[in-house]
From Swiss-Prot:
Gene Ontology molecular functions: ATP binding; phosphoribosylaminoimidazolesuccinocarboxamide synthase activity
Enzyme class: ligase
Protein name in UniProt: Phosphoribosylaminoimidazole-succinocarboxamide synthase
A single cellular component GO annotation: cytosol
Pathway membership, UniProt: Purine metabolism; IMP biosynthesis via de novo pathway; 5-amino-1-(5-phospho-D-ribosyl)imidazole-4-carboxamide from 5-amino-1-(5-phospho-D-ribosyl)imidazole-4-carboxylate: step 1/2
Reaction(s) this enzyme catalyzes, per UniProt: 5-amino-1-(5-phospho-D-ribosyl)imidazole-4-carboxylate + L-aspartate + ATP = (2S)-2-[5-amino-1-(5-phospho-beta-D-ribosyl)imidazole-4-carboxamido]succinate + ADP + phosphate + 2 H(+)
Record's keyword terms, sorted: ATP-binding, Ligase, Nucleotide-binding, Purine biosynthesis
HAMAP family associated with the record: SAICAR_synth
């Protein structure tokens, strides 16, 4: 397998084509963004940490029967993945109130949400990822009703698997986002799962162990990411 041309450069990852039309190389960079990409900084080791973290989580989800785009780890910062036709809508599962939900509804941060909330957002930085629903998806043709139902089912299944994984490590999985795509007609989990796209709190102290440390200028971003990785069993070095 040979890495070829750059296909897409996102806020924290770069995607490359390969000599296999069905496979891509995903490179995790040290960039960290907030405010829909308006604020970007670099942190040493972040690309490596997120790459290995994501590979670990995707492997756990695959073991649980959730189809993922993951093929294999290539290097400290690169992974080989299936080329998906991405759905332009992201799924968010919320176990506790935080972030935009608190701002939108004026509820207390940390409120337990039982059953968990399932939200949909259109992936559009210029419009600040507006919240949408199943009706929008059907009307605008973003994803079929059947595929959307599958995305919801897989998101909630991932929540069960990961909530237990983090709980066993002394962490609360507050919320997280997932992105899906189609591979040969099948819904497959793509993009990444890392502390960049999830909220993780320490069970005892409620300390934030995710990208909110960057968003809220709390400091210690990489130290928090590495601590979460260590607790769940990710081998970094």
């Amino acid at each position: 397998m040979q890495k070829k041309a750059e296909l897409y450069r996102g806020k924290a990852k770069t995607v490359y084509t390969t000599d296999d039309p069905d496979l891509l190389v995903l490179e995790f960079r040290n960039d960290t963004s907030a405010l829909d990409g308006e604020r970007i900084e670099q942190f040493d080791r972040k690309g490596m940490v997120n790459n290995k973290f994501n590979h670990f989580i995707m492997s756990k989800l695959a073991e649980a029967g959730i189809p993922t785009q993951m093929e294999r780890l290539l290097s400290d910062t690169e992974v080989l993945v299936k080329k998906l036709d991405m759905v332009p809508v992201e799924c968010v599962v919320r176990n506790r109130a935080a972030g935009s939900l608190v701002r939108r509804l004026g509820i207390e941060e940390g409120l337990v949400l039982n059953p968990p909330l399932f939200d949909l957002f259109l992936k559009n930085d210029a419009k600040h990822d507006p919240m949408v629903n199943e009706s929008y998806c059907e009307t605008f043709g973003w994803v079929s009703k059947e595929h959307l139902a599958e995305m919801k089912e897989l998101s909630l299944k991932a929540n069960e698997v990961l909530s237990k994984l983090f709980d066993d490590a002394g962490l609360i999985l507050v919320d997280f986002k997932l992105e899906f795509g189609l591979f040969k007609g099948q819904i497959v989990l793509g993009d990444e799962f890392s502390p960049d796209g999830s909220r993780l709190w320490d069970k005892e102290t409620l300390d934030k162990m995710d990208k909110d440390r960057f968003r809220q200028s709390l400091g210690g971003l990489i130290e928090a990411y590495e601590e979460v990785a260590r607790r769940i069993g990710v081998i970094l070095d």
